[in-house]
């Protein structure tokens, strides 16, 4: 195409090479005209693109870009978590929104060809505990043993199967005190309740090996592993109610917490047991028998006597992230042991600073040992007052109950929602479940029913009953 020796011409925007050759008496000149730089593109997503999470949970943001040299992040709200400033051209980040609401995350990327941006939106719904506070409460039934009148319910868990005396979904409770006695730690019974309002308690087992039972967990065959403080045993009760002591008895130091962990990959099934000497043990299982014993942690601060014991308790396991949570009553803290299945003998030394004050509360601990990096404090103080029990909610948060030992003027019988990903751990406000005498809350359990409702059960020591709260899915 011939063109004038000077001038301009508009052409369509295309990616091509332009060549202009000019001739004269001395020959031709043909300068190279490079194509324009390509515009950046950005792909930016959160799980489900437009997603909803409960307050207290984290969101993973992921992005890729092309033709970009730099990117800048921003959020529509200062409650969106830490997603601001410079980011690489491709990457991902996990953010924990700090309040309910609608949040838009924006990523703007720039390159030599221009700029482009993309957004993703997240709805942060109310926390589960905040919905519990307005939900109705139902009395399931009395926890008093129908034969001996043992009372003062401590341990509480749910049956995973139907076997022997137990039906799947039944509530299994152990009583800390013997009938007609006020002395703490004398109870010797485990009872069951069908999970319907007005249920009557039925006896599962009675034995001196269960004396002072304060926590329990069920194996897949409904065998009951019980922490028997006074007996200094960890008996195993069959679903038919037969009590045995298959585990080494010389290794316990007054068991005070229990959690069962199913086999996962190369990790065999195990029981985790906390003791009143401040240690955490792992009993590796072969069926219902012990194949190995490992003390994975020691050093939690302990003190007190039955009825006012400060020791690690409330053991709760999250199988999705192989994490064991421990309620540290002495320091008013909740501790996480991550990758707990891989923690070896003496792997965590808890530096509890037990002698730094005259008595509880003690400072939140630090950690040393070969697996020290697996241990961290996820919440401390903030209204926790001698916390004792915990359960895992459907979204991965914990519900934690105070034991109210020497509570003074503080509000008694409160539960807290604790997030392992939210800075500081505390989600929303605590909820008071019983307005009566302090120290009503002991065992607590959580599940999800067939309709997707979050169910929370708790032992109310003031009423010697199991209570139920239901929260419908959002």
Please annotate each region the language model reported:
Residues 85-104:
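Solvent-exposed segments in extracellular or luminal domains encompassing
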């Amino acid at each position: 195409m011939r063109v004038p020796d000077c001038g301009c011409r508009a052409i369509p925007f295309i990616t091509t090479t332009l060549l202009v050759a000019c001739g004269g008496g001395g020959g031709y000149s043909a300068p190279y005209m490079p194509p324009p730089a390509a515009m950046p593109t950005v792909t930016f997503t959160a799980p489900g693109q437009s997603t909803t999470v409960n307050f207290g949970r984290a969101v993973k943001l992921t992005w890729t870009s092309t033709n970009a040299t730099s990117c800048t992040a921003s959020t529509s709200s200062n409650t969106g978590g830490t997603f601001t400033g410079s980011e690489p051209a491709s990457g991902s980040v996990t953010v924990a929104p700090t309040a309910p609401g609608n949040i838009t995350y924006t990523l703007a990327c720039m390159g030599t060809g221009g700029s482009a941006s993309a957004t993703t939106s997240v709805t942060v719904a109310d926390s589960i505990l905040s919905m519990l506070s307005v939900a109705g409460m139902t009395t399931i039934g009395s926890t008093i043993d129908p034969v001996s009148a043992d009372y003062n319910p401590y341990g509480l868990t749910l049956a995973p199967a139907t076997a022997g005396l137990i039906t799947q979904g039944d509530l299994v409770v152990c009583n800390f005190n013997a009938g007609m006695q006020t002395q703490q730690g004398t109870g010797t019974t485990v009872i069951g309740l069908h999970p319907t309002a007005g249920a009557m308690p039925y006896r599962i087992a009675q034995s001196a090996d269960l004396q002072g039972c304060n926590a329990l967990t069920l194996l897949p065959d409904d065998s009951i592993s019980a922490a028997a403080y006074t007996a200094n045993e960890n008996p195993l009760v069959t679903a038919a109610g037969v009590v045995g002591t298959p585990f080494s008895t010389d290794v316990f130091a007054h068991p005070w917490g229990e959690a069962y962990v199913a086999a996962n990959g190369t990790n065999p099934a195990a029981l985790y047991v906390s003791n009143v000497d401040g240690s955490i043990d792992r009993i590796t299982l072969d069926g219902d028998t012990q194949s190995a014993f490992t003390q994975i942690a020691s050093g939690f601060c302990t003190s007190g006597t039955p009825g006012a014991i400060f020791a690690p308790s409330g053991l709760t396991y999250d199988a999705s992230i192989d994490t064991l949570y421990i309620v540290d009553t002495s320091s008013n803290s909740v501790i996480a042991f991550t990758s707990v299945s891989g923690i070896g003998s003496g792997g965590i030394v808890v530096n509890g600073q037990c002698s730094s004050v005259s008595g509880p509360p003690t400072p939140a601990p630090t950690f040393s040992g070969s697996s020290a990096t697996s241990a961290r404090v996820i919440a401390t103080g903030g209204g926790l007052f001698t916390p004792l029990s915990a359960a895992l909610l459907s979204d991965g948060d914990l519900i934690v109950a105070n034991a109210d030992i020497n509570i003074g003027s503080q509000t008694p019988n409160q539960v807290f929602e604790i997030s392992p990903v939210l800075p500081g751990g505390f989600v929303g406000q605590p909820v008071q479940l019983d307005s009566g005498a302090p120290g009503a809350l002991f065992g607590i359990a959580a599940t999800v029913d067939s309709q997707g409702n979050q169910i929370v059960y708790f032992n109310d020591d003031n009423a010697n009953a199991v209570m139920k709260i239901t929260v419908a899915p959002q």
